[in-house]
């Protein structure tokens, strides 16, 4: 709690409150420690986390991350991940949480141990959007490159494939110019940035590319 106060003293950026302890997250929400609602990270289908957090953020500006895991852990089968996501989405809707404030994280696995990870990630993105088009899908992109050489190339290509599949956001370093360039390029290529206005503006602002 002391860290929340410290951070709010130096930035106007909404905070992401991160803890595996749902009761701690609930306490922070109930006691009003956060001045500018940001994101709660996270809920899942293990225990009663959804039931604890969703009633507290319903009707508020808070966003929330939902992990596709349950009491048995993270399933390897993408269809099981999608089923968990559906249960989280249904509970969010039941408690009145706006679905466009729910961000499902399909828990990206490393290709070093699960070669189908990229294909599975794409399947999850599409499957979640098919079930609930307004729900956001996010993911920790760098998870996919654990134990791989020159990890940034794996990460950049993972980002490209994921955006093409419909990824809405990513857990990543926002100062990584290579990844920022990949995002802008993919949005132009997939017609999310029609005419390339955003990529041109970002390049001129020095957000990616060679610094002059």
Segment roles from a protein language model:
Residues 16-24, 43-48, 140-146, 152-153:
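Glycine-rich beta-to-alpha transition loops that act as phosphate-gripper elements at the mouths
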Residues 211-212:
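Long amphipathic alpha-helical segments
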